[in-house]
């Protein structure tokens, strides 16, 4: 597969993961989690809708499905892990930032294969793209403190 500039294959990590495709999967997962939060839909229906409607855009479909199913399945636990680092209740956090935080918390807890810095950076970039003007700074602060608690050895190592 060639990159957008036509200059050869897209860069991949040693494990074969294409970071650009993962980023796209995260953006689509954000949209799915946001839709779920707003509609209260069933997890399988939300995933099926986004996987079907945007199949050509969800480049890493397996990762997209893992993120969405993971957040929807573990939502109460993720909220509990985030709560000590919030300055308000999780329900009072803007819906986009709430979805970004839940996705970030899921990756920090359950996707140890993804470095914490990547999780935080991707969350910041997603919040900048979809969130409020300063939402990305809030996301950064919350996830930075959560990472210290959830991945202390990695963060301090």
Swiss-Prot record:
GO molecular function: RNA binding
Protein's name in the database: Transcription antitermination protein NusB
HAMAP family for this protein: NusB
Family statement drawn from the similarity comment of this UniProt entry: Belongs to the NusB family.
Keyword Cytoplasm: no
Any one GO cellular component localisation term in the record: cytosol
Lineage: superkingdom: Bacteria
Role according to the record: Involved in transcription antitermination. Required for transcription of ribosomal RNA (rRNA) genes. Binds specifically to the boxA antiterminator sequence of the ribosomal RNA (rrn) operons.
Keyword terms of this UniProt record: RNA-binding, Transcription, Transcription antitermination, Transcription regulation
Entry-linked InterPro entries: NusB-like_sf, NusB_fam, NusB_RsmB_TIM44
A Gene Ontology BP annotation from the UniProt entry: transcription antitermination
């Amino acid at each position: 597969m060639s990159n957008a500039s036509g200059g050869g294959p897209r860069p991949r990590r040693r494990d074969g993961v294409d970071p650009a495709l993962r980023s796209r999967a995260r953006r689509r997962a954000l949209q799915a989690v946001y839709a779920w939060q707003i509609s209260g839909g069933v997890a399988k229906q939300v995933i099926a809708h986004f996987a079907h409607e945007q199949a050509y855009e969800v480049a890493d479909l397996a990762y997209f499905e893992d993120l969405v199913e993971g957040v929807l399945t573990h939502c109460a636990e993720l909220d509990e892990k985030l709560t000590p680092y919030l300055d308000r209740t999780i329900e009072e956090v803007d819906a986009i930032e709430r979805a970004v935080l839940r996705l970030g918390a899921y990756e920090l807890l359950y996707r140890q294969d993804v470095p914490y810095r990547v999780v935080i950076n991707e969350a910041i970039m997603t919040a900048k793209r979809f969130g409020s003007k300063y939402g990305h700074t809030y996301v950064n602060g919350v996830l930075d403190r959560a990472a210290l608690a959830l991945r202390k050895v990695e963060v301090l190592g």
